[in-house]
């Protein structure tokens, strides 16, 4: 279904401006029109509390020399700068050849939030993307 939405309506495609910005950052990987699931567990922020919730979407994932970006529909839902110290606390794994799992603690990116957020992306070559994340250049590597 996600491929159909992508091909017919462009849902899950990065905006042109974002694509140009990513190209300038040294785009290592880009997958558009992919299925993704976002899951919140024991999530709290302000007055909102979620014990467990999942949301499916069509989106895109990109990895550059500077950041990891995930879009759901046409909105950015995850934008992690590789220079951010919290990036080292993000768990990226490949539970099967076509699934990429990105798990993080909400508090690492928002001091007013708590709980766990997991993104599951159905992307061809997920293992290669997970490997790129593991081998990314960290700020300490530059010095």
For the regions a language model picked out, list residue spans one by one:
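Low-complexity, intrinsically disordered/propeptide-like segments
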Residues: 25, 85, 103, 132-135
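Anionic N-terminal interaction surfaces
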Residues: 1-60
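Phosphoinositide-binding peripheral membrane targeting modules
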Residues: 42-116
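Mixed-charge, glycine-accented linear interaction segment located at domain edges/termini
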Residues: 128-143
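Canonical phosphoinositide-binding patch of PH/PH-like domains
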Residues: 107-131
